[in-house]
């Protein structure tokens, strides 16, 4: 898939506006735990462009390093998502409490520039918003493009489309499903190591009787995946399910999803099984392993993800 363009030329833009870094309250990135909030400051650059500084922990309990010494690409995806929420709240005035509904999310990580050291990694996330539609003076939908630099080197790019809805509109849209509820897994996890995890509590898949198909496990007490009461399965949990399914179908060789593209079609509900299926596909280039992952619930497509990563030996 194509990478997002590099959006901000830091050298040419450095003197165009007053450069004052602004702090990031956790509410603006929809997190309640400081260890799960990655943007730390932001600067408006003008013309629907922003620069966000983010820090990546080297020892996050959920977004742990992959393949021994690389930052998890899904940690990058989550950082991009938080940077987008930040600029729409702080830069455009979308009220806190509005729902941030992502329809697509694509990313490309350059693993050579995402090595893990003994300290936090500081990233500069360039954010550009486009195709904005406004209602009542604030955006209701748009496209976001990101370019991530670490020590001046391009470490990742991404693009997404998203919508924003008020609590009132969201409740009407969700109807009987709008009430947050709890979910406790009633099925055993697949072995953590086979799913690319080290802890059973982070495994979101259970075995099924069908080949290369697993049942989604949802535990609303998970401290990272569920920061607050929710009425549906979060998109980042679905991305994690896709990653784990890719690990299972490509194992025993490790799978690192350095490239990902996801289309979210409908909500995954708590009250019905969601089935995750993975298929190895021809890769976009030599040396890459590609997996197509789908989620279905009650016979309908919930999401479609394509993940690619370096072909490692087992």
UniProtKB/Swiss-Prot annotation:
Q: What is the effect of changing residue 240 to A?
A: Cannot produce active gamma-butyrolactones
EC class: transferase
Q: What is this protein called?
A: 2-oxo-3-(phosphooxy)propyl 3-oxoalkanoate synthase
* EC number, UniProt record: 2.3.1.277
Keyword Mitochondrion attached: no
Phenotype of gene-disrupted mutants? Deletion of the gene leads to a strong perturbation in the expression of three pigmented antibiotic clusters. It also affects the secondary metabolite cluster responsible for synthesis of the siderophore desferrioxamine and expression of the genes encoding enzymes for primary metabolism pathways, which supply antibiotic precursors and genes for morphological differentiation.
Taxonomy, superkingdom:
Bacteria
One Pfam match, given by its short name, reads AfsA
Catalysed reaction equations from the record: a medium-chain 3-oxoacyl-[ACP] + dihydroxyacetone phosphate = a (4-alkanoyl-5-oxo-2,5-dihydrofuran-3-yl)methyl phosphate + holo-[ACP] + H2O
Q: Which GO terms describe its molecular function?
A: transferase activity
Give the protein's biological function: Involved of the biosynthesis of S.coelicolor butanolide 1 (SCB1), a gamma-butyrolactone that triggers antibiotic production.
Keywords, A to Z?
Transferase
Family according to the record: Belongs to the AfsA family.
The effect annotated for residue 243 to K is: Cannot produce active gamma-butyrolactones
